[in-house]
């Protein structure tokens, strides 16, 4: 923890095409080595593919996918005496979104499609339908929290 003042949150401008702040934040997660234009091309390309396949608002599907991936609880390690316990804690809303975006991008990168836009579109569609690797990750995290419910009295 820093001993100085806490750094102010930077304001993230809405993305130019859809006017969505959450989509702009997602582009920052997709971006590598500061290449924002490449990240925009990937995300907009993925949303176009989603629109082609589903014939509905791609932003709606994106938000539905994020909700399906975002975890409600997670486990944190807490050392008590000589033992380390996995203590389940509730995830605050900003971290929920950050984790969902991170998992979505990570599992999209591991898919087999040809381009990143296609991988991202595939993972978005799978997540919106409640399947896919990112949704499985959320279920695993929830299962870990459920299994360690006995240690929930070791609150942070």
UniProtKB/Swiss-Prot annotation:
Keywords for this protein: Ribonucleoprotein, Ribosomal protein, RNA-binding, rRNA-binding, tRNA-binding
InterPro entries: Ribosomal_uS7, Ribosomal_uS7_bac/org-type, Ribosomal_uS7_CS, Ribosomal_uS7_dom, Ribosomal_uS7_dom_sf
Single GO BP term: translation
GO cellular component, one term: small ribosomal subunit
GO MF annotation, one: structural constituent of ribosome
Assembly with partners or alone: Part of the 30S ribosomal subunit. Contacts proteins S9 and S11.
Name of the molecule in the record: Small ribosomal subunit protein uS7
Native organism: Pseudomonas fluorescens (strain ATCC BAA-477 / NRRL B-23932 / Pf-5)
Gene: rpsG
């Amino acid at each position: 923890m820093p001993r100085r003042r806490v750094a102010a949150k930077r304001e993230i401008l809405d993305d130019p095409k859809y006017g969505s702040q959450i989509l702009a934040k997602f582009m920052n997660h997709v971006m590598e080595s500061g290449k924002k234009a490449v990240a925009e091309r990937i995300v907009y390309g993925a949303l176009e593919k989603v629109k082609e396949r589903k014939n509905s608002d791609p932003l709606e599907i994106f938000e539905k996918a994020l909700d399906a991936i975002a975890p409600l609880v997670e486990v944190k390690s807490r050392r008590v005496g000589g033992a380390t316990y996995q203590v389940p804690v509730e995830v605050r809303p900003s971290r929920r979104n950050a984790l969902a975006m991170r998992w979505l991008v990570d599992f999209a990168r591991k898919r087999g499609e040809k381009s990143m836009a296609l991988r991202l579109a595939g993972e978005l569609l799978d997540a919106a339908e409640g399947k896919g690797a990112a949704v499985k990750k959320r279920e695993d995290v929830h299962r870990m929290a459920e299994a360690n419910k006995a240690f929930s009295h070791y609150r942070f």
